[in-house]
Curated annotation (Swiss-Prot):
Similarity comment: Belongs to the bacterial ribosomal protein bL27 family.
Gene Ontology molecular functions: structural constituent of ribosome
Pro-peptide region(s): 1-13
PANTHER family cross-referenced by the UniProt entry: LARGE RIBOSOMAL SUBUNIT PROTEIN BL27M, RIBOSOMAL PROTEIN L27
Stretches the record annotates as Disordered: 17-39
Entry comment on modification after translation: The N-terminus is cleaved by ribosomal processing cysteine protease Prp.
Organism: Ureaplasma parvum serovar 3 (strain ATCC 700970)
Name this polypeptide is given: Large ribosomal subunit protein bL27
Length: 100
């Protein structure tokens, strides 16, 4: 009788240790920021010139700025990057001249 009691009182322990979770292992999707058109390239109206967070580059002549600071061409022409006020950069679109 004593042996039977001992068998029913047997407690089994886990054979494998519990595995913790890691706080790493995730990343955000790429945002594809930066210049889409370089200096001297031709552009059409509405074409994106520069995608940015904040004003790294400022809009110049014939360039609009979206609510997410994306710079786009208002008219067809040639893209021109220029420095102003020391270290700031602006981008303009110089309209194409028609030779008719």
């Amino acid at each position: 009788m004593n042996k039977l009691y001992w068998l029913t009182d047997l407690q089994l322990f886990a054979s494998k240790k519990g595995v913790g979770s890691s706080k790493n292992g995730r990343d955000s999707n790429p945002k594809y920021l930066g210049a889409k058109l370089g200096d001297g390239q031709s552009t059409k109206a509405g074409q994106i010139i520069y995608r940015q967070r904040g004003n790294k580059i400022y809009p110049g002549l014939n360039v609009g700025q979206g609510k997410d600071h994306t710079l786009f061409a208002k008219t067809a022409g040639v893209v021109k990057y220029t420095k102003f006020m020391g270290d700031k950069t602006k981008v303009s679109v110089l309209p194409k001249e028609d030779n008719n």
